[in-house]
Structures are given as structure tokens and as C-alpha cells.
Design a protein with these regions (language model features):
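HTH-adjacent hinge/linker in prokaryotic transcriptional regulators
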Residues: 2-30, 34-97, 108-116, 120, ...
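Conserved phosphate- and dinucleotide-binding cores of soluble alpha/beta proteins
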Residues: 2-14, 18-24, 30, 44-45, ...
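Glycine-rich beta-strand-to-loop/alpha-helix junction loops that act as flexible
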Residues: 99-101
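N-terminal active-site wall of soluble small-molecule enzyme domains
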Residues: 104-106
């Protein structure tokens, strides 16, 4: 049986069962554990499956992003840990971008005492928080308003970002995998691509609960990021997959 045939069978089994063990796959195709692992790694690189401990599962699909209010209550400890680690990378006097989201809001909460900082954001909550609690210079992108996430999206926001020179961009996502970050909202893609082009350094900040999920629009491949910051809940298989792509991964320890 050639690799293409094996991988098709794997996809069919995963589609039927949701999650399949490596033992099941080796028995079904009468091949070695190592052969199956190579097939699974190839499929994961394509974004077709997600490796889990001892097996493989289909990637979860994000049909829509939760509202800001809902996201605030999710993975709070992990986001705080990521925010603290990300903030430690910021230098006084720099110009940074904080993408819309509750993980990036956690970064802002650790930056309120930093001197001579300029923060660019498309997020109204982040801008409002920094306005009340810091002395930093705040630049808001403006643009079409996304009510659910209290942020600006679309071409107007993207055009504004292209006019800036950003030292560090901290970019968030509702879903990520070895293929990259994705979103169910097309109007968010142009903003993320614009800030990636405008920034000297790009940092993905995303908690491990979102890993292995996919949405309709691929916003940025992981190769666009200089660093990825996540929490210690990331599966070992995911860490190995990211290491194979020679990606810089920083793990924030949950306190």
C-alpha cells in the first residue's frame, strides 16, 4: 500500500470515529508504528488532522468567534501567564501592536508602568484600559467596527496599519494549527496580514486550548511569526510538530 492510499484510509477512519489510536491504524494497514507516525505528521502539516497522545483526531472547526464577554471567561490563568511572558519581551521606548483579543489585553495589563511606550491597537477595550491606567501613547486603527469583539476590522484599519513602522506585533487568533492561524471572519484577515507586513517582529500569542482548531480563512502561516507564545497545556505532539518547522516556541508556565 502506497503512502497516498494509507493517508486516505487514515482520513476516512478519523472522519468516521473522530479519534483513532495509532495501534488501530497499524493493525488496519499492517505497517510499522514509525510508518504510521510519518503519515500522521504529513497529514498534520497539511492541517488535515491533529496529533494527540497515542493517536490522532480531526481538527475542530471554528464556525464563529465568541464575543469579547465570553472570551474574557475562557482560559484566564493561561492568558495571564502568556500576557506576563509576552510583556517581558517589550522594551521601553518601543512601538508595539496589540491585536484585538483578551490574550493581548492580558499583555496590556503588564505594561501599564512601562515608560515611553507607544501602543497601536484595533481593540477598543485595550485602548480604553491603557487610557485609564497608563501614560503610554495610544494609537487606534479606526475602521469598521466589529461589535462582538469590540474592535476594528477591514480595509480601513489595514490601510492605517500599513502606514506605520512597528517594532513588535503581538497577534492573537481564535484558532491555530501547524498550518497557521485562521479565522471565520474574512474582514479580520486583511488586518492581520497588514500588521505582519508593517512589523519588524511578529509574535503569536495564543493559548493551547485553541490549538488544533481551524476556521475558514487562513490569515497567516506560522512561518510568518518570529516567536510563538503559548501555555504549558500544549500537547507534546504539537510541540514536536512545531519544532520540526524550526519555529521559536516560548511556553508560559501556568501559576
Amino acid at each position: 500500500m502506497i503512502p497516498v492510499e494509507r493517508r486516505q484510509i487514515i482520513l476516512e477512519m478519523v472522519a468516521e470515529k473522530g479519534i483513532v489510536s495509532i495501534a488501530e491504524l497499524t493493525d488496519r494497514m499492517n505497517v510499522s508504528h514509525m510508518t504510521i507516525r510519518r503519515d500522521l505528521q504529513k497529514l498534520e502539516q497539511q492541517g488535515a488532522v491533529v496529533l494527540v497522545s497515542g493517536g490522532v483526531q480531526s481538527p475542530g472547526r471554528v464556525a464563529h468567534e465568541p464575543s469579547h464577554q465570553v472570551k474574557t471567561a475562557l482560559a484566564m490563568t493561561q492568558k495571564a501567564a502568556i500576557g506576563k511572558l509576552a510583556a517581558s519581551l517589550v522594551q521601553p521606548g518601543s512601538c508595539i501592536y496589540l491585536d484585538a483579543g483578551t490574550t493581548t489585553l492580558a499583555i496590556a495589563q503588564y505594561l501599564i508602568h512601562m515608560e515611553s511606550l507607544t501602543v497601536v491597537t484595533n481593540d477598543f477595550v485595550i485602548a480604553d484600559y491603557l487610557l485609564d491606567n497608563s501614560n503610554c501613547t495610544i494609537i487606534h486603527t479606526g475602521g469598521a467596527v466589529c461589535r462582538e469583539n469590540r474592535s476594528c476590522v477591514g480595509e480601513a484599519a489595514a490601510t492605517m496599519l500599513r502606514s506605520l513602522m512597528i517594532d513588535q506585533a503581538f497577534i492573537s487568533a481564535s484558532s491555530w494549527s501547524v498550518r497557521g492561524i485562521s479565522t471565520p471572519a474574512e474582514d479580520k484577515v486583511t488586518v492581520k496580514r497588514a500588521i505582519a507586513s508593517a512589523s519588524r517582529q511578529r509574535v503569536l500569542v495564543c493559548d493551547a486550548t485553541k490549538y488544533g482548531q481551524v476556521a475558514t480563512w487562513l490569515a497567516l502561516p506560522l512561518s510568518e511569526f518570529d516567536q510563538i507564545i503559548t501555555d504549558d497545556g500544549l500537547p507534546e505532539s504539537a510541540s514536536r510538530a512545531l519544532a520540526k518547522q524550526d519555529l521559536s516556541l516560548l511556553v508560559a508556565k501556568n501559576e
